[in-house]
């Protein structure tokens, strides 16, 4: 709709640029290298340019009103309201999420500090400073000495978050990241992608050896966030520049396109190294845990833009809410990518998140259980 509303303006701008280019090239031979950015043109001539932009769609609307055929009048009405529509669409986005007050901030920081103890306790020398997948507390304490690319990526980002919350110093952050990256660089990989599971005590890949597309995407997104965050603390601890370079090198070595089905424009679920075959299934829904991986792949040009359009947006309705569906409807599928991908209000992804919460709460109320069902149940 926005493109249609701006059609007269775009046509006029293109025609004007063409005429000026021909005039300067063949007649005046002057100002052929002049170029003014849109921001500068708005700053130096805001009133005149704004008036011209508003006037041209209105002029087209008036002319089309006198057209002899009815469809033209429809476009006339559309162009008539184009200036208002375009102005509203240009307003800067403002979030309605309120910041926690001082008391809530203290509670959240205390909870984060308690969660952080998981990494300080179990990312130890025995585990090669890699995060165990899980720890059983009862009836006996038992550590699962295995880890995945997602676990490792989240651990790296948790280190950065701990520094953001002043739970650790920049020097401690550097030390922890160096130790973990030392181990990651020793892990066997496939086309640069980490395998699905590793033994944290031996650093060997666990059988059956498998490369997960989603795990690879999660790891790459975590490395991207880590790299950006480290630039804030590197001036305090220059060694963090080297850590950042190592993270960037790991990211650059990963080839997601090796997991892409170019015929169907979808990502395979993964690659089985034991059988040397791709999995039969593919990630074909937008609202799934693979959304973050798909976004990264398109942004890094490891997958074409049409891949994003190939992801299905199957819709559903319940209790006045409408949203896109996931395969199993878990919180993990909907909200895991939200850790890194912003969902703005009145967008498809934002409405899908609201729809997920509504359905989860409705189901929990019927079954008299807490809401928030995820992969763990």
Predicted regions and their residues:
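Alpha-helical bilayer-embedded segments of polytopic membrane proteins, i.e.
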Residues: 1-15, 37-86
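Ser/Thr/Asn(+Pro)-rich, low-complexity disordered segments
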Residues: 46-55, 70, 74, 78, ...
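Short acidic (Asp/Glu) and glycine-rich catalytic loops that position anionic groups and cofactors
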Residues: 1, 38-41, 93-97, 315-317
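Membrane-proximal soluble regions of multi-pass membrane proteins
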Residues: 1-40, 106, 110-118
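Juxtamembrane/interface segments at transmembrane-helix termini
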Residues: 13-31, 72-74, 81-102
């Amino acid at each position: 709709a926005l493109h249609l509303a701006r059609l007269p303006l775009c046509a006029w701008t293109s025609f004007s640029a063409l005429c000026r280019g021909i005039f300067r090239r063949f007649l005046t031979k002057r100002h052929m290298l002049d170029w003014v950015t849109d921001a500068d043109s708005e700053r130096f001539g805001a009133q005149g340019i704004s008036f011209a932009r508003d006037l041209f769609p209105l002029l087209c609307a008036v002319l089309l009103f006198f057209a002899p055929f009815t469809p033209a009048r429809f476009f006339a009405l559309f162009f008539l309201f184009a200036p208002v529509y375009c102005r509203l669409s240009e307003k800067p986005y403002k979030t309605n999420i309120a910041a926690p007050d001082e008391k809530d901030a203290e509670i959240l920081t205390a909870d984060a500090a308690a969660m952080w103890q998981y990494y300080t306790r179990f990312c130890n020398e025995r585990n090669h400073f890699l995060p165990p997948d899980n720890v059983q507390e009862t009836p006996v304490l038992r550590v699962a000495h295995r880890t995945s690319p997602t676990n490792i990526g989240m651990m790296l980002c948790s280190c950065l978050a701990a520094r953001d919350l002043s739970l650790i110093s920049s020097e401690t952050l550097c030390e922890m990241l160096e130790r973990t990256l030392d181990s990651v660089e020793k892990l066997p990989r496939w086309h640069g992608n980490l395998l699905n599971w590793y033994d944290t005590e031996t650093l060997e890949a666990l059988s059956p050896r498998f490369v997960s597309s989603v795990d690879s995407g999660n790891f790459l997104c975590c490395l991207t966030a880590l790299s950006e965050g480290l630039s804030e603390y590197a001036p305090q601890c220059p060694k963090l520049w080297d850590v950042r370079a190592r993270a960037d090198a790991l990211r650059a070595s990963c080839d997601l396109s090796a997991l892409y089905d170019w015929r169907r424009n979808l990502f395979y679920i993964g690659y089985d190294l034991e059988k040397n075959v791709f999995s039969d299934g593919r990630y074909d829904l937008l609202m799934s845990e693979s959304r973050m991986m798909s976004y990264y792949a398109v942004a890094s040009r490891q997958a074409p833009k049409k891949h994003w359009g190939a992801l299905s947006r199957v819709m559903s309705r319940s209790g006045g809410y409408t949203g896109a569906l996931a395969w199993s409807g878990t919180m993990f599928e909907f909200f895991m990518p939200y850790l890194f991908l912003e969902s703005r209000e009145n967008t498809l992804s934002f409405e899908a998140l609201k729809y997920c919460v509504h359905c989860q709460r409705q189901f929990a109320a019927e079954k008299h259980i807490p809401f928030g069902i995820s992969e763990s149940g």
